């Protein structure tokens, strides 16, 4: 269906729209849009993904654009969070711009971009000590140990570790918890504490904050 695309060129999916929200936090914008009946497929720190369907109309497009313009105006006016997003947790008297700057400062201070990038660096990929089947069998046979998240470095995970967003497996069963992987998930615990309404779903990391733990292979 796309015969006009030149060879070796990447094809942008015409049914997906990726919106960069910086300086507004993408999860905040997602909450706002969903409260106005606009469905966001997913969000990370500063991007939103929308899916376009064949039946979508120009009216729906214009509606989304008007809501984004409303957000922009609210940001410039530093509209109180109690007005813009009354259902979200914020500091007393905090405006939308104040909240957004605090969010950005947190990500910069914690090195969110660096921590995320390290997960996709081939030099830092975890080593597999067991196959997925072996890890699953070890778990079922009781050769497992529950350890606090901060003490997971160097241990063999018996569960898949997956944060959503982005919905990409970071650690497969049988792979070793590396410093890069652990640092990222410790950061996510801080993120969940600082912005509880934006907590990502994390498969394989149980509990929250100081109570977070993971299942690893029991040491001999």
Model-identified regions with their sequence ranges:
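Non-catalytic terminal extensions of PLP-dependent enzymes
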Residues: 2-220
């Amino acid at each position: 269906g796309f015969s006009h695309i030149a060879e070796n060129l990447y094809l942008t999916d015409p049914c997906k729209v990726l919106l960069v929200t910086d300086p507004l936090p993408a999860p905040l914008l997602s909450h706002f849009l969903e409260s106005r009946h606009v469905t966001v497929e997913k969000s990370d720190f500063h991007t939103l993904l929308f899916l376009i369907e064949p039946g979508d109309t120009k009216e729906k497009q214009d509606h989304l654009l008007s809501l984004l313009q409303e957000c922009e105006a609210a940001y410039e006016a530093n509209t109180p969070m109690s007005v813009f997003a009354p259902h979200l947790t914020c500091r007393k008297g905090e405006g939308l711009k104040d909240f957004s700057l605090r969010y950005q400062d947190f990500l910069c201070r914690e090195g969110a971009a660096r921590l995320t990038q390290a997960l996709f660096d081939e030099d830092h990929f975890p080593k597999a000590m067991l196959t997925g089947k072996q890890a699953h069998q070890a778990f079922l046979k009781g050769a497992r140990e529950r350890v606090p998240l901060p003490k997971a470095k160097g241990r063999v995970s018996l569960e898949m570790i997956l944060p959503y967003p982005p919905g990409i497996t970071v650690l497969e069963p049988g792979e070793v918890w590396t410093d890069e992987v652990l640092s990222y998930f410790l950061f996510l615990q801080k993120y969940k504490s600082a912005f509880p309404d934006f907590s990502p779903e994390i498969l394989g990391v149980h509990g929250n904050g100081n109570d977070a733990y993971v299942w690893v292979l029991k040491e001999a």
